[in-house]
Amino acid sequence: MKNLQEKVKDIVEVRDFKRLTDFTVDPVKTLSNYHFTDVTAELMSKWLDRIVNLQGQRLPAFALAGYRGVGKSHFLAVLGAMMQHPDLRSRVTEPLVSTAAQRLRRRHYPVAYVRRGLKSTLREELIDALALSLELPASDLDLPLEDLLGLASDKGGEVPFILIIDTASEREAHVSRDDGAFLSEIAETAANKNVFLGIALDDDIAGADGINSAISRSYTIDYLDQEHLYKVVEAHIFPKRSQMQAVLHGVYDHLRRHLSTFRWSEQRFTALYPMHPVILEVAPIVRFYVHDFALLGFAAEAGAKILGRPADSLIGLDEVFDLVEDDLRKVNDLTEAFAAYDKLNKEVVGKLPVMQRLQAKLVLKALLLLSMDGSGKTAGEICAAMLFYDEKNTDKALKDIADTVDIFIKAMPEAIQGKADNSGELRYGFKLSNKDGLN
């Protein structure tokens, strides 16, 4: 096919993206490294207007929900940077946000960042954050919540005190506690004070059932979906060369023609190219286990490495796996899966004919990543995720993948299984101790 003679570099420009591990350390970098989309610009304008109009009104707190890695923490840190440093507001080039920022008082707003996961309770983390902002010893702040937020309100004076609650990026483990009731209590108390409260809802507190249903009553919840990331990637990480759109269409058409299970739309494929769309689907799950995995930084770094490849060679799951493997191996919930992975890699993959080894190794990597959501994947879905296809025989790749996974299952049925879904099609996956879908 003529189009596939083109290289990735002929179609796309790969731009650098500076990855930040802590958005609160350098406000200038935090702001300059943030790319607004129409969605986040509207959200930021809305949040800024709430701060402007806060005084004298009993208004609910704000919460930002969304998949891990979608940009909630960066959004909150940008808000904090603009509130804390009035000189930075003039650097905002997004018109909607710039206009909203101009309505703020041209002075410093006190800000406190509560970092969930660093102490045993949210109350302790709140006290630590307020102690830093109020410049008081934490031991002096063992007070009722009403008094704590009263001190914060007094600190603000004529402007609201900005209280931001987010999960700490440097936490050692996933936060597994129920903070819903106390978050609701903080919101109810802040509503009577000159305190603006904004929080990030991670999966451990985002449920709308049980005790955490209190959050939906106490907060105005905005949702930041992955569509935002598609737009950032397309505009700021992988801008396409306009004269090569026909070539890119040809690449997509080629994949769809030879991979019937390639289910992603052309719009989505084009936005993310040269990154496989499946990566955005596994990114939140990877981020759950590897806290410092940053999709945009990964995309920029991986993109720079594949510029010389053929146009149909996408950044794939194997590159994600290679980047995060060492960190995933440290996760207790994945210990058994990696023990099985190592055994299969050594005793099964290593003994296959040379021509089959590379594909089998790639299947093993993909299967482990794709199993982490607990649902399992069909042979067709694995083919589409890894771009396995045979131009002369479209059924051959499906059979090869199914045969390869069957070899894994026969070797270690206690670790990998194939389970029929409602349609009768087999879904394959590693058995993970904390996932019930496939298990």
Task: Please provide the spans of the model-predicted regions.
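Sensor-1/coupling segment of RecA-like P-loop NTPase cores
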Residues: 170, 186-211
